[in-house]
Design a protein with these regions (language model features):
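Short glycine- and acidic-rich boundary segments immediately preceding or forming the N-terminal edge
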Residues: 2-14
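Conserved beta-strand hairpin/beta-sheet module of binuclear metal-dependent hydrolase folds
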Residues: 11-73
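Active-site metal-binding motif and surrounding structural segment of the metallo-beta-lactamase
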Residues: 57-109
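A short beta-to-alpha transition loop/helix N-cap that caps and shapes the active-site region
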Residues: 110-115
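Short, hinge-like loop/turn segments at secondary-structure boundaries
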Residues: 118-123
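Extended, charge-rich helix/loop segments that form flexible
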Residues: 126-140
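Conserved small/polar residues in nucleotide/adenosyl-binding loops
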Residues: 141-146
């Protein structure tokens, strides 16, 4: 295996990691503090791999890329790898902004639609149960303890 000597891209920049593959690094406003997005140069144009979290910061980052290193590029589409909000959140914005199609698997589309239509507390219960089954403590925080 060859170790690549590459630097993390800064805001509004792309890092080329192969002849036809580029890396974008978007900050996130929570503990998982970033998401890596990739762009592939194809014969049909740039294929965006994942969209980023729906946020003002992501929109500003995409605007900087679109008006900067991607300014003269044609876009082939958007491929969403999985339903997590930090990967699918900006999909609609990118589709509208770039007039491109979005591609994902039926399973990921179904999962995204299911979770999006679910109340926040139900969504939280599902993930709490997943983490507890994986060995996490059931009680992570109680608001009563904050007053002590």
């Amino acid at each position: 295996m060859t170790k690549l000597e590459i630097s993390k891209p800064k805001f509004g920049e792309l890092t080329q990691i192969a002849s036809d593959l580029y890396w974008a690094h978007f900050e996130l406003p929570f503990r998982l503090n970033h998401v890596n997005l990739f762009l592939m140069d194809t014969p049909s144009g740039i294929l965006i791999l994942d969209a980023g979290l729906k946020s003002d910061h992501s929109e500003e980052h995409w605007e900087a890329l679109i008006n900067g290193p991607l300014k003269s590029k044609k876009f082939a589409g958007l491929l969403i790898t999985h339903y997590h909000p930090d990967h699918i959140g900006m999909a609609g914005w990118l589709q509208d902004k770039l007039n491109i199609k979005c591609y994902t698997s039926e399973k990921e589309l179904f999962t995204a639609k299911t979770f999006r239509s679910m109340p926040d507390d139900k969504y939280a219960d599902i993930f709490r149960n997943v983490f507890v089954r994986a060995g996490m403590s059931c009680l992570l925080y109680t608001s009563d303890a904050a007053d002590d």
